[in-house]
Curated annotation (Swiss-Prot):
Its EC number is 3.4.-.-. Gene3D superfamilies: PmbA/TldD superfamily. Keywords: Hydrolase, Metalloprotease, Protease. NCBIfam families: PRK10735.1. In strains containing the pMccB17 plasmid, required for the maturation and secretion of the antibiotic bacteriocin microcin B17 (MccB17). It comes from the Bacteria. The keyword Hydrolase applies. Belongs to the peptidase U62 family. GO terms for molecular function: iron ion binding; metallopeptidase activity; zinc ion binding. This is Metalloprotease TldD. One of its GO terms (biological process) is protein processing.
Length: 481
């Protein structure tokens, strides 16, 4: 269904047919290439921002174009055009294939539709509500947050939606298309008491229409729940004391704290870093790289999730990839280029920000599978340490695996009980060492609410993260107490 719909909107509307794509791929193959592809994209994006009870910003953007890639060995020729036409395709193909002078046979495998499971709706979220209905969601969030506590001074809420159509045709016979909706709601609040100010934030989204935000979440409208959560987090930090410093046990909460796993481990398991030998995990397949309690997967096949892809941006169907199993490194996330050069199989992780960018190995939804311990058992096992259920930003060095992460919500654990909230706690360590220090894995796997944005080499993409509650026996905590 996607292929027919997208072909009509991206190709037929611009006077193109599948035969034209086959002919352009044939032009690429007139040089001695290992692979060539055409990537068509049309995206519609809107965003709205409410601040101080006023709609302060609204934007709408349409972008479409085509990227043409030619690969020979490790060399890549790439050209793109911000219009979709036969002339633009021909000129881009001419430019992309100039990396190779040797003649090829001009043969291309017959294009065949790639079969894949529908993982999300093909409804255009931008058309799923009127403008006033969208703005009413923001006004609702503002009202709920302010009514939640009189100490709330400022509320900022933003709503964004994307409707994206993509089509891929390649010299290996790939012909695939996808329709990708994506929505996100974010809320940030500022609370003040006795001259002391703190912020809290919440939100979420996924591959839905905007009605998702008005649906039920545990007996409450989802948008309302997130507004109250932002207020709760801000109030927690209002009463927080300075975090202790030193090496101690750290309990990481379920869900969004999986961002540490994403950064400190996930990036190091992307194929390009490992082919170049620049990852701490290079050459470690089959080796014990984590506690035997740890199984980590990257799963592009989750229904409606922010990071999911029915097909990746090279036309490979999204897959469920086991990266680490019982502590043993099983494999890397691959795109077509790095898979071919490493003698491996593409894993559905070839992703790109747009037609104007080259694809590379990227994560989809990366998470750790649940274990057998209850969260309560994990907390009770700690005499003195930190419980971190929410994270802020972080940085990681792919080569060494070293990371620094700041917590946005954290508590002291004393004598097996969560006691007072702390602020200013940063977690410092290295990916492999931290994974090997995991001594308990919870039975409460949770994925994030759908807010993840991953950056790599200047390209931003939607991703998902998750994990159960985890106990790390020894982690360096940077604090101010």
């Amino acid at each position: 269904m996607s292929l027919n719909l997208v072909s009509e909107q991206l190709l037929a509307a611009n006077g193109l047919k599948h035969q034209d794509l086959f002919a352009i791929l044939g032009q690429l193959a007139e040089r001695r290439l290992d692979y060539g592809d055409l990537y068509f994209q049309s995206s519609y994006h809107e965003s709205w921002v409410l601040e101080d009870r006023i709609i302060k910003d609204g934007s709408y953007n349409i972008d479409q174009g085509v990227g043409v890639r030619a690969i020979s060995g490790e060399k890549t020729g790439f050209a793109y055009a911000d219009q979709i036409s036969l002339l633009a395709l021909e000129q881009s193909a001419q430019a992309a294939r100039t990396i190779v002078r040797d003649s090829g046979d001009g043969k291309v495998q017959t294009l065949g539709a790639v079969e894949h499971s529908p993982l999300y709706t093909s409804v255009d979220p931008l058309q799923s509500m009127s403008r006033e209905e969208k703005l009413d969601i923001l006004r609702r969030v503002d009202k709920v947050a302010r009514e939640a506590d009189k100490r709330v001074q400022e509320v900022t809420a933003s709503l964004s939606g994307v409707y994206e159509l993509i089509l891929v045709a390649a010299t290996d016979g790939t012909l695939a298309a996808d329709v990708r909706p994506l929505v996100r709601l974010s809320v940030s609040v500022l609370v003040e008491e006795d001259g002391k100010r703190e912020r809290g934030a919440s939100g979420g989204g996924g591959r839905f229409g905007y009605e998702f935000f008005l649906a039920d979440l545990d007996g409450e409208v989802r948008a309302d729940a997130w507004a109250k959560e932002a207020v709760r987090m801000a109030l927690v930090n209002l009463s927080a004391v300075a975090a202790p410093a030193g090496t101690m046990p750290v309990v990481l909460g379920a869900g969004w704290p999986g961002v540490l796993l994403h950064e400190a481990v996930g990036h190091g398991l992307e194929g390009d870093f490992n082919r170049r030998g620049t990852s701490v995990f290079s050459g470690q397949v089959g080796e014990l790289v984590a506690s035997e309690l740890c199984t980590v997967v990257d799963d592009g096949t989750m229904v409606d999730r922010r990071g999911s892809v029915a097909i990746d941006d090279e036309g490979t169907p999204g897959q469920y990839n086991v990266l680490i199993e019982n502590g043993i490194l099983k494999g890397y996330m691959q795109d077509k280029l790095n898979a071919r050069l490493m003698g491996m199989t593409p894993t559905g992780n070839g992703r790109r920000e747009s037609y104007a960018h080259l694809p590379m190995p990227r994560m989809t939804n990366t998470y750790m599978l649940p274990g057998k311990s209850t969260p309560q058992e994990i907390i009770e096992s700690v005499e003195y340490g930190i419980y971190a259920p929410n994270f802020g930003g972080g940085q990681v060095d792919i080569t060494s695996g070293k990371f620094v992460f700041s917590t946005s919500e954290a508590y002291l654990i004393e004598n097996g009980k969560v006691t007072k909230p702390v602020k200013g706690a940063t977690l410092i360590g290295s990916g492999i060492e931290t994974m090997q220090q995991i001594s308990m894995v919870g039975n409460d796997l949770k994925l994030d609410n759908g807010v993840g944005v991953c950056g790599k080499e200047g390209q931003s993409l939607p991703v998902g993260v998750g994990q159960p509650t985890l106990k790390v026996d020894n982690l360096t905590v940077g604090g101010t107490a």
